[in-house]
UniProtKB/Swiss-Prot annotation:
ATP binds at K613. GO terms for cellular component: cytosol. This is Leucine--tRNA ligase. A motif ('KMSKS' region) lies at residues 610-614. GO terms for biological process: leucyl-tRNA aminoacylation. Its EC number is 6.1.1.4. Keywords: Aminoacyl-tRNA synthetase, ATP-binding, Cytoplasm, Ligase, Nucleotide-binding, Protein biosynthesis. Gene3D superfamilies: HUPs, Isoleucyl-tRNA Synthetase, Domain 1, Valyl/Leucyl/Isoleucyl-tRNA synthetase, editing domain. Belongs to the class-I aminoacyl-tRNA synthetase family. Pfam families: Anticodon_1, tRNA-synt_1, tRNA-synt_1_2, tRNA-synt_1g. Its main location: cytoplasm.
């Protein structure tokens, strides 16, 4: 029996595509352009896993489809290759991280090519290539020139084990680092920052123009966190000092009964009384050991210390105690809050814990029992009494501005981007600090500032990166004899990935980041597919850099990615015991259809979980390609379910996809191809063309494959296969199973050319309509026959067919026909006596 020999056919076509540069990006100016982008991978030592090809297959299907529709298609791949794992490996082994990275890239590329993706490898990029990061550094110098890259002494998330500071977004909810799970402590340090806050409003507003999942837009909106309210100034009793708080509810100022400063607030030491000094110092130290996320956890017990100082509430002159508490962050807002415990749950819990005054200023609720967080008329609020929320806010803001103690204010939760890392394996920041106190950017003609090769990449121990150890590279002298020192921090991994999609457009340009006309031709990216885990960090950073490049005239669009799609996660097979603990697959055996823990004998429940080394349920695509073939993997991952759903891996499903491809192969090896159309497959063929075309456009690949299966089932019932329908089917199959399609195309079309650019088939709307219908024939209201007739016959034609049917003739023999009622396309009712 014929079968699809993937081990022979797939390498054959991969070789053909590579030798013929089949997927080189088209440059025909008369054709429309289509840019399909994957989130490029970090080339880890573990290699590709089966989650990677899901998104890659989706963009590949679109790319192959668009080529056949006459588009120039840009479908590139590259490597996000800077990062901590390579550096950690280098420190552990003494090997160069560049060598480790090159080996990993070679392995990734081998695996990707084995899956038959139609990438234009002439455009391959690598963020660690000096010819690439020259332009990453160039963008930084432009940000620096515009005042958007600056140095600041800021409390950072310091990870001792990693020897570096990490961004807020890289701290997990439990206060450990995303990479490695190490403890994170707060520590003041000189850092490079990027002023992403200058773009907050545009980053927020321009989301409306994007075809992105609403959930991702909401995550960005929440991260940017726009708030409208007022700044209020509180004087500190018996001093000439004051502090400012931001509040979204200035109308509740009469209910402010205490104030809270962040432990790091600049005023804390100056206002703390002698009696409270030790308690305040101890508390500040304890707070420094916690991450921002741990400090602001709503579920944690409230802690704080009174400073011994009082503030004056500007609206009523009352003295209110000033506390410090770790749930207030120096980096958020002004680092100070006014507490209105009657109407805020956190303030109420804090007030109850430390026996502080609670004054209701909104009618409703019982503030002795709980904070009242609904709205209501104002009470205990002097000139605001009786007013609703909106009117009271307006009146209070007007009062604050008239009295010179406050003003209307818009704030954002978004913080400036902590851009420096104290590591070796990253882009050097192109800045020189001179002994006369000035700093300058490395001139463009000296870029790239190449990362020096060294075996000594251990952290310096001073908080600086290992580059601080390399004095030959570090120390420079200006033409006028002034000595300088290069910046030792390196850029975060996010830097190279914030603009890589631009370099694909013109990857070999030595004069500029990319040619303006080419950028105009290809931007914005038409479809960007990747994991939802990048919703905030990568996508927000890339949008920020793109808007900056738009402002300085480098790119022609305001946004980088017009359409975004997040593929779901492929979950692994895993097992849980009665305590819901996960059991590794190598500790499980199957008996009589049930699963048992080999060590304890306990029966286990099968439950999908994220693939992990510890559960030993990671599926390597190399193994799948070896056993089943790349086309099987592609078809299976697209047929598992909706592209955005998280679905468990299944060997049975994989086998089902392989059987489908074998059935396709046998169909073309067992049926005679004919040039005359019998019409038997007209409807199902044209339905298949219509359905697959529409489903590809909508990224509903699972239903497209289901329709291909329907056609195969119908075709198998026929003795012969109309050659034009055979060709059309192969074309529809090609984006999903390109190797098999190429092989079948050569046998059927016999053109000697790849199927990759053959014009996509079209469907005939008139053929989608049923040509025949089934009607019932009744005698005196009882069904006596069912007949298949041509659609839309007249009443007279139906009557004639019914009365001439042999079965009906025998039923009415010898009887008088009183009346015949015909309903086109439905029934004929014969009344006899």
């Amino acid at each position: 029996m014929a079968y699809y020999n993937h081990k022979e056919i797939e390498p054959k076509w991969q070789k053909y595509w590579a030798e013929h540069h089949t997927f080189k990006t088209g440059t025909d100016k008369d054709k429309p352009n289509f840019y399909a982008l994957d989130m490029f991978p970090y080339p880890s030592g573990a290699g590709l896993h089966v989650g990677h090809p899901e998104g890659y297959t989706a963009t590949d299907i679109l790319s192959r489809y668009k080529r056949t529709q006459g588009y120039n298609v840009l479908h590139p791949m590259g490597w996000d290759a800077f990062g901590l794992p390579a550096e950690q490996y280098a420190m552990d082994t003494g090997n160069d991280p560049a060598d480790f990275t090159a080996e990993n890239i070679a392995n990734f590329k081998r695996q990707i090519n084995a899956l038959g993706f139609s990438y234009d490898w002439d455009r391959e990029i690598n963020t660690t290539d000096p010819n690439y990061y020259k332009w990453t550094q160039w963008i930084f110098t432009k940000l620096y020139e515009k005042g958007l890259a600056y140095e600041a002494e800021v409390p950072v998330n310091w990870v001792e084990e990693l020897g570096t500071a990490i961004a807020n977004e890289e701290v997990l909810p439990d206060g450990t680092s995303e990479r490695g799970g190490y403890p994170v402590v707060r520590k003041p340090m000189r850092q490079w920052m990027l002023k992403i806050t200058a773009y907050a409003e545009r980053l927020l507003n321009d989301l409306e123009e994007l075809d992105w999942p609403e959930s991702i837009k909401d995550m960005q909106r929440n991260w940017i966190g726009k708030s409208t309210g007022a700044n209020v100034t509180f004087k500190i009793k018996d001093t000439d000092k004051d502090f400012t708080v931001f509040t979204t509810r200035p109308d509740t100022l009469f209910g402010a009964t205490y104030a809270v400063l962040a432990p790091e607030h600049a005023l804390v030491d100056a206002i703390t009384s002698a009696e409270q000094a030790q308690a305040v110092a101890d508390y500040k130290h304890a707070a420094s050991l916690k991450s921002d996320l741990a400090r602001t956890d709503l579920a944690k017990d409230k802690t704080g210390v009174w400073t011994g100082a009082y503030a004056i509430n500007p609206v009523n002159g009352k003295e209110i105690p000033i506390w410090i508490a770790d749930y207030v962050l120096a980096s958020y807002g002004t680092g100070a809050i006014m507490a209105v415990p009657a109407h805020d749950e956190r303030d109420w819990e804090f007030a109850k814990q430390f026996d502080l005054e609670i004054i209701p200023v909104l009618e409703g609720g019982n503030v002795a029992e709980a904070a009242y967080t609904e709205d209501g008329p104002h009470i205990n609020s002097g000139f605001l009494d009786g007013l609703d929320k909106a009117a009271a806010i307006d009146k209070m803001v007007a009062w604050l501005e008239a009295e010179g103690v406050g003003n209307e204010k818009v704030t954002y939760r978004l913080r400036d981007w902590l851009f420096s890392r104290q590591r070796y394996w990253g882009e050097p920041i192109p800045i020189i600090h001179w002994e006369d106190g000035t700093s300058t950017a490395v001139p463009e003609n000296e870029l790239p500032l190449v990362l020096p090769v060294t075996k000594d990449i251990r952290p310096s121990g001073t908080g600086e990166s290992p580059l601080a150890n390399l004095t030959d590279w570090l120390e420079v002298t200006r033409e006028d004899g002034v000595k300088g020192r290069r910046e030792t921090n390196t850029m975060p991994q996010w830097a190279g990935s914030s603009w890589y999609y631009l370099r694909y457009i013109d990857p070999h340009n030595n004069e500029k980041l990319a040619d303006e006309e080419l950028l105009k031709a290809w931007l914005p990216v038409d479809i960007y597919i990747g994991g939802a885990e990048h919703a905030v960090l990568h996508l927000l950073y890339a949008r920020f850099w793109h808007k900056f490049l738009y402002d300085i005239g480098v790119v022609p669009t305001k946004e980088p990615f017009q359409k975004l799609f997040n593929q779901g996660m492929i979950l692994g097979t895993s097992y849980r015991d009665s305590r819901c603990a996960l059991v590794a697959t190598d500790k499980v055996e199957k008996r009589d259809g049930s699963f048992f823990n080999i060590e304890t004998g306990e029966e286990l429940e099968q439950a999908p979980a994220k693939m992990s080394k510890s559960l030993k349920n990671v599926v390597n695509p190399d193994d799948v390609v070896e056993q089943y073939g790349a086309d099987t993997l592609r078809v299976y991952e697209m047929f598992m379910g909706p592209l955005d759903a998280s679905i468990a891996w299944s060997e049975e499903g994989l086998e089902g996809s392989r059987k489908f491809l074998d059935r396709v192969y046998r169909l073309f090896n067992s049926k005679e191809l004919v040039t005359e159309n019998s019409g038997a497959l007209d409807k199902v063929y044209h339905e298949t063309v219509k359905s697959v075309t529409e489903q590809i456009e909508e990224l509903k690949f699972n239903t497209a494959i289901a329709q291909l299966m329907i056609f195969v089932n119908a075709a198998n019932k026929e003795e012969k296969l109309y050659v034009e329908y055979a060709k059309g089917f192969i074309q529809l199959l090609a984006p999903f199973a390109p190797h098999l399609a190429e092989e079948l195309w050569q046998a059927v079309a016999q053109t000697g050319e790849s199927i990759s650019y053959v014009t996509w088939p079209t469907y005939d709307e008139s053929k989608l309509v049923e040509a025949e219908v089934e009607i019932v024939v009744q005698i005196k209201g009882k069904v006596r026959a069912k007949l298949v007739v041509a659609k839309d016959l007249s009443r007279e034609e139906l009557q004639e067919i019914a009365l001439s049917d042999e079965k009906i003739k025998s039923e009415i023999a010898g009887k008088e026909i009183v009346k015949v009622i015909s309903v086109p396309n439905k029934l004929v009712n014969i009344v006899v006596k």
